[in-house]
Amino acid sequence: MFYLRGCGRWVAASFTKQQFPLVRLSSDSAAPRTPHFDVIVIGGGHAGTEAATAAARCGSRTLLLTHRVDTIGQMSCNPSFGGIGKGHLMREVDALDGLCSRICDQSGVHYKVLNRRKGPAVWGLRAQIDRKLYKQNMQKEILNTPLLTVQEGAVEDLILTEPEPEHTGKCRVSGVVLVDGSTVYAESVILTTGTFLRGMIVIGLEMHPAGRLGDQPSIGLAQTLEKLGFVVGRLKTGTPPRIAKDSINFSILNKQTPDNPSVPFSFTNETVWIKPEDQLPCYLTYTNPRVDEIVLNNLHLNSHVKETTRGPRYCPSIESKVLRFPNRLHQVWLEPEGMDSDLIYPQGLSMTLPTELQEKMITCIRGLEKAKVIQPGYGVQYDYLDPRQITPSLETHLVQRLFFAGQINGTTGYEEAAAQGVIAGINASLRVSRKPPFVVSRTEGYIGVLIDDLTTLGTSEPYRMFTSRVEFRLSLRPDNADIRLTLRGYKDAGCVSQQRYERACWMKSSLEEGISVLKSIEFSSSKWKNLIPEVSISTSRSLPVRALDVLKYEEVDMDSLAKAVPEPLKKYTKCRELAERLKIEATYESVLFHQLQEIKGVQQDEALQLPKDIDYLTIRDVSLSHEVREKLHFSRPQTIGAASRIPGVTPAAIINLLRFVKTTQQRQAAMNESPKTDQCLRNADRLQERQL
Amino acid sequence: AVNKAEEPQNPPQLGHLAIIKPLVYLTLRLSLPDALIRLPSGSRLCTRRSSGAAAPGSGATIFALSSGQGRCGIAVIRTSGPSSGHALRILTAARDLPPARHASLRLLSDPRSGEPLDRALVLWFPGPRSFTGEDCVEFHVHGGPAVVSGVLQALGSVPGLRPAEAGEFTRRAFANGKLNLTEVEGLADLIHAETEAQRRQALRQLDGELGHLCRGWAETLTKALAHVEAYIDFGEDDNLEEGVLEQADIEVRALEVALGAHLRDARRGQRLRSGAHVVVTGPPNAGKSSLVNLLSRKPVSIVSPEPGTTRDVLETPVDLAGFPVLLSDTAGLREGVGPVEQEGVRRARESCNFLATVVASVGAQSPSDSSQRLLLVLNKSDLLSPEGPGPRPDLPPHLLLSCLTGEGLDGLLEALRKELAAVCGDPSTGSPLLTRARHQHHLQGCLDALSHYKPSKDLALAAEALRVARGHLTRLTGGGGTEEILDIIFRDFCVGK
């Protein structure tokens, strides 16, 4: 059923133990023939695939365990990737050599950059993706990743052993037990179970257990986690019905065409696989009062809407939109599901009405009068684990070497999942090789904001990335994700290829050189007016104007500037990307200077690490209120910076913690060179290097 | 004489009240007004750092009045940070810095107007050999409020300088390894006290007209920012209503006008209220106004035998036992009277409402925890018959006074002196001068940031201007988190798909 390929890296769905010798890689020759890996990743969704490949890129022998190999890379909900904020995450995943951006460049059918007119800091790279192509390309990539093994199987339980004394946590994970009773051992385990933990699908008043339509949920694993003492919450989400393409009257609807030229997601690609003229359009239609009427008249048939489980405020079902914003027309985007797909995805019509009512409602909508529903929309309710129970490296506080990534942590969206996947994969691998964790700070990337928000504040609704969550938005842009993360990913994590690293280094030095050259060119404003007549340079004084300041004007780009001052600027226009990035740097230059000051302040707090083994509830040397102790105990912040962001942790408590860190450092220094002190110092040193 | 307070509206029942009926309670509540609303540094950190206001990083240069407040011959103002030297040169109009660690006499003048401020001793401590490890300057100026206020405002006008956050000097010193652990021990307590005091100060300050204004402005700005953010995060795919940006633009411009007018006005109009704050409160006809008149030695309040004569909060600056004090007379606390008096009662409660909870929770056991203190005074002691029984023995510690005969006044003044010494000597209470400098700094900062709001160009830049502006306002009003923004977005718009 699955074929083997390439030097035994790919183990086909192993249903029997007899097939395990293929992957027996245990270094202990005396050990029985039980498979042993460095890292096991459970789940083959967007977090799982990124986690598995990231761990493998870092050099770990990795096993990806999934219910069904043919659903690896499945896009279970919308047929699109990216968007505002989410596109930022994808650029960062790509900067760490993750997969999703590259796969999207090979699988899209409609590429469009959102927010084009609102400034490059908030551009949102987005594309409609061919589901089938994405899955194919993803599976090809996964199967060709060195050190990565894929196996089918449902995990029922975790194998736990005594904890390592030098780390916190009440036990340590050392493998998994599958449903068939077989065991696989590993140094680290990553759970990326998405909505499968006690997943429940809801249509109308019907509910049945499932992680995704047609897939079994994970119940044993959910029980294991609860027994271990993890705090579990419940969330809900939904997906719209799918409509037959040939039953829609597109001719009366607004058409949206893709960008020309298409902008690729990945730093390594200059173009995407498909020409703009071959791409598919999207169409826009609106709901109307008849839709509202059907929703309101049938609330009694809709248990998902009535339930109290928290759903997202921002990805609401049509039912909650009608309830919260009555008497309005709501947008419905009709999106292609793929090149040769007969389905259309009505974005904006997520619903859980009984199936027959879904069709009735849809046929009320303009253009959909004769629409046929091929698959009904449905709601999903699932368990998530309070993300305050994990560290910024995504390892759990409770169980050593157990990592969580993706929807299990209360997020929503492919991109949010992928971002966590990369970080979990890297850290699971670093943990095996006993290296310090790879943590992205809020000051370094959207990934950092996402994980810091989750681990310090938790979440009560599915967490989605917005640019408004990011305080250093002008510094953390889609264009400079490589400068921010690729270099660190190469040096600190080892997850980045040599080629990508060298490209990022070249880009960084070229940008720095370009900016300093642009700063050094100074002319009077009248001379600039002669050189570039189309721009009206406003100067109140007769001070000389730098080329960098001229480049700030909307009408000016590197090309026009290089035409005016060919030497030495001409060479910076040869690389399109470099020229565009210099323009962006110029646009934000003045603000970035101030933001850098602020970033330094935050990083100072981030550099002050709190010892991991503090027992906040009993510790005596620190005077802290009971409330503060409980909060610190639950979230276990790793740095003073993170502690100070927890609501309710007072400034006085922070100062007390500072004092405690200092005392601990001194004590440890006295005890002759402790690794923790070293680490604190190293981190402080690294700060200097990390400045943009 | 610090007492566990009774709720003013609910005086303790006296056993022999029949005999000493005229004996009435007066409570004198002491607190410092207008002291720093400096929000503790952590309270900013606790919010998501969307403020955009200057962070306590190595970048910013901070200044503060570091000598105690009250009357003093010399006041010391300190700066710390990379722009310290620059600030010193600007204020002394000198090209060179004075020799390091030597006291030099210099004429300080306001860099904006050139107006001389004071002849002062200045000391230049280049880092790292300084208190904080950074470049520091000390200005030893003559201690009058006008001079101190002038120098603080002059410093605030130097680019790159801002008023220090609570404990920020110490924190910097700590970060740079300049403090030993015993020195830091006290810091936490200090910051705790500051936080507590500031919470009340902020409440009190923000009760007034200015607070009302600030909160209104912050609300407007938060909403405008939320709408711009919604336009950035959702505008493309979702159908936001028409004119969201235009509306935000109109509101921001109106805010700019209001802020500008206020700032021009504030320089002349804002009365500098220095000193400790003493509120006289109690039931009607207890003789509160008589006591105020007695203490201020002038007829501040109208007195009459009729209960409810005082219907508003009357404030008068007085010199009490050598301390500058703002004395407030309040309406008697009672229910069921006319609307005007009810308003007076409401204001009276408000003027000490931030005390009520503290009084109830702090009590006599841990008075040091709070800068808020209470004296229980029983007036009309002249009506006690000398041979009759005294006030009930189970009353909390109290003072007897007769405003009519003046008997007991010396005892009261002595008790007040002790309290005031404790309050004014408390390092946790900041200077009102700094409060004002701080207000002006942030309002000006807000106004400056708003001038960079140009939504027609790069919207991310425009939003950044609003974020910085909002950061300045929320430093004064509190709040300022990202969640507030998201709440408004999801309340006002149907976004998401």
UniProtKB/Swiss-Prot annotation, chain A:
Positions annotated to bind FAD: G43, G44, G45, H46, A47, G48, V155, S218, Q407
Residue spans of biased composition, Basic and acidic residues class: 683-692
Annotated positions of the N6-methyllysine modification: K508
Cellular component, GO annotation: cytosol; mitochondrion
Catalytic activity entry: 5,10-methylenetetrahydrofolate + uridine(34) in tRNA + taurine + GTP + A + H2O = 5-taurinomethyluridine(34) in tRNA + 7,8-dihydrofolate + GDP + AH2 + phosphate + H(+)
Location, primary (coarse class): mitochondrion
Entry annotated with the keyword Transit peptide: yes
Record key words, sorted: FAD, Flavoprotein, Methylation, Mitochondrion, Transit peptide, tRNA processing
Chain's role: Component of the GTPBP3-MTO1 complex that catalyzes the 5-taurinomethyluridine (taum(5)U) modification at the 34th wobble position (U34) of mitochondrial tRNAs (mt-tRNAs), which plays a role in mt-tRNA decoding and mitochondrial translation. Taum(5)U formation on mammalian mt-tRNA requires the presence of both GTPBP3-mediated GTPase activity and MTO1 catalytic activity.
Protein name: 5-taurinomethyluridine-[tRNA] synthase subunit MTO1, mitochondrial
Lineage of producing organism: Eukaryota, Metazoa, Chordata, Craniata, Vertebrata
